């Protein structure tokens, strides 16, 4: 059985116990949290192997057929370029300026109403975005005051979607100038429908994700329940296939998974061969 739950939901199910009624593996678009590891221990899931399967980037994307224009009505031929601070200002609940348009944030940006569809709290993409963008882009005053940098505004300019990326595409296609937050693999497989803004002047690319020069790059993981190894038929066949050269250099690469560096890959293979507990 394969079930789509989001990273948070997957860890919750994975940690609930050992046995055929519980998952063997959970995929996660961010590292397991300490509180999730503690939940696993409470559920009797004591031995866990962490597998870093590749890298990903988070795209701040809009409809591919939308033409951005500056405040003078002139076409922005190079697309739109946003900083983490500008995205935070557009999305943050505790931004006292409460901008209505991107122009309200910076005069170089278009007079287009801010409309952003964000992943739900259960999503690992949401966790990674909040850590890499909302927290990093948070204004100094908020950090000093120990405010909640990751809280989204609730006035209609930011809405939460579900786990189905297709709904995000539908939203930004209908509402021109709207943004959605996607993983790179989804962007790369839907370039006819969606395009990504630059972040801090850097375009999203496979190379930029692999070397982390793209500002919203992140690792991807799955977690193996060691108690199921040797009990559940085919479990290690699946794991070994997932990290094989054939997969990572062929069909997973075609699907948008960005490869690990040789050094990182060697560590992953060693951890799998020795079924090394990650904690």
List where the protein language model places each region.
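Flexible loop/hinge segments at secondary-structure junctions
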Residues: 1-279
